[in-house]
């Protein structure tokens, strides 16, 4: 499904976006997300609960077509939220704005957590539309994590004090022969999913930090479990967005990342939602160490999820451009490879997490 002909898009949005996705794709300002489990429950649990019930009504999980129909019915049943575009926003950098325009994302005024529920349903519908029509070449485990990320997000938002419970994910059939803009369609829609799950993971990490600071072990465990499932979903989103061969990448995707289509140096590093997630991760070490000291395995399993997400990103990048090609972000004349840049970020991000449970490092159990 693409945008209706009468839809008004922001000035500067590239023409290709509306050809491959339903836009505008509305998201709130991630800086306004709640920071505690109690705030989260008050802000969004009722709406998220409606979404969970809608996606799990009898028969909704029999196959992807049934899940798509349930998703669309659920979206239609929810009362509208949001009060139009944010407009001028002092918290938005020029690079943030460039990235939003490139993917048809419109920052919307209104209750940010409820907007996240709606964005999750919109992103899920976008993926299911393609899968019902075209199938998917994602391996089954990646597909389960990818779609399972939506269930984890909505389930946790509905009951923030409990770890999200997995739901049945119908499998996707193998992808059919390529059609026009197939790769670009997955690229744009996969990025919509990534931004939704990145907001969710940032939110879960913030709630983990607050719970740990208050000594709330059940709350910290629930938040950590949500963060792990959402990071696994982010991994699936990266693999889905990068499901293209090198020819498709060079012909359909790379031109959208470079002038004249894109501003110079546009990069996913400047996604507003990614920036907020990275900020939360950078400040989370004490919380993960506290949780580890309580004997929890969540810090180790989240660390593994984060590492594997970066490994998948490295794999996608290497598949597209090889392990020696310079990054689009590289300074003029630099020979630093794109794969090397991602690997360095992997090292930095993992340094925010304890390497193993504290009780295994000689601390009292």
Swiss-Prot record:
Class in the EC hierarchy, top level = oxidoreductase
InterPro entries the record matches = Tet_transcr_reg_TetR-rel_C_sf (IPR036271)
Purpose of the protein: Heme-containing peroxygenase that mediates the hydroxylation of 3-methyl-L-tyrosine (3-Me-Tyr) into 3-hydroxy-5-methyl-L-tyrosine (3-OH-5-Me-Tyr) in biosynthesis of saframycin A, a potent antitumor antibiotic that belongs to the tetrahydroisoquinoline family. Involved in biosynthesis of 3-hydroxy-5-methyl-O-methyltyrosine (3-OH-5-Me-OMe-Tyr), a core structure of saframycin A.
- Please identify the protein, giving its name as recorded: 3-methyl-L-tyrosine peroxygenase
Task: Alphabetically list the UniProt keywords.
Answer: Antibiotic biosynthesis, Heme, Iron, Metal-binding, Oxidoreductase
Q: Does the keyword Transcription regulation apply?
A: no
What domain of life does the UniProt record list for this protein's source? Answer: Bacteria
What organism is listed for this UniProt entry? Streptomyces lavendulae
Instruction: Report which reactions are catalysed by this protein.
Output: 3-methyl-L-tyrosine + H2O2 = 5-hydroxy-3-methyl-L-tyrosine + H2O
Residues binding heme are 313-317
EC number from the UniProt entry? 1.11.2.5
Which cofactor does the UniProt annotation name?
Answer: heme
């Amino acid at each position: 499904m693409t945008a209706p002909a009468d839809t008004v898009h922001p000035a500067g949005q590239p023409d290709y976006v509306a050809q491959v996705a339903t836009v505008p794709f509305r998201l709130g300002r991630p800086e306004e997300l709640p920071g505690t489990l109690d705030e989260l429950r008050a802000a969004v649990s009722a709406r998220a609960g409606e979404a969970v019930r809608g996606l799990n009504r009898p028969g909704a999980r029999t196959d992807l077509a049934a899940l798509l129909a349930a998703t669309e019915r659920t979206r239609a049943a929810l009362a509208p939220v949001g009060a139009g575009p944010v407009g001028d926003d002092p918290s938005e950098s020029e690079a943030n704005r460039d990235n939003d325009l490139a993917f048809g994302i419109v920052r919307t005024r209104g209750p940010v957590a409820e907007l996240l529920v709606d964005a999750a349903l919109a992103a899920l519908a976008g993926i299911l539309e393609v899968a019902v029509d075209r199938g998917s070449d994602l391996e089954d485990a990646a597909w389960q994590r990818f779609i399972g990320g939506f269930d984890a997000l909505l389930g946790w938002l509905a009951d923030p004090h409990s770890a999200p419970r997995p739901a049945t994910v119908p499998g996707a059939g193998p992808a059919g022969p390529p059609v026009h803009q197939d790769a670009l369609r997955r690229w744009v829609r996969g990025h919509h999913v990534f931004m939704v799950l990145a907001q969710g993971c940032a939110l879960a990490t913030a709630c983990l930090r607050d719970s740990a600071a208050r000594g709330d072990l059940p709350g910290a465990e629930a938040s950590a479990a949500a963060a792990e499932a959402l990071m696994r979903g982010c991994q699936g989103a990266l693999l889905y967005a990068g499901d293209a061969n090198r020819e498709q990448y060079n012909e359909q995707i790379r031109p959208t990342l470079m002038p004249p289509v894109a501003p110079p140096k546009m990069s996913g590093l400047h996604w507003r939602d990614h920036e907020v997630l990275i900020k939360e991760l950078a400040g989370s070490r004490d919380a993960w160490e506290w949780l580890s000291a309580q004997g929890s395995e969540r810090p180790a399993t989240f660390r593994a999820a984060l590492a594997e997400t970066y490994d998948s990103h490295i794999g996608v990048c290497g598949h597209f451009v090889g392990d020696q090609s310079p990054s689009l972000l590289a300074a003029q004349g630099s020979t630093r490879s794109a794969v090397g840049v991602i690997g360095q970020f992997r090292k930095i991000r993992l340094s925010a997490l304890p390497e193993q449970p504290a009780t295994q490092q000689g601390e009292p159990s």
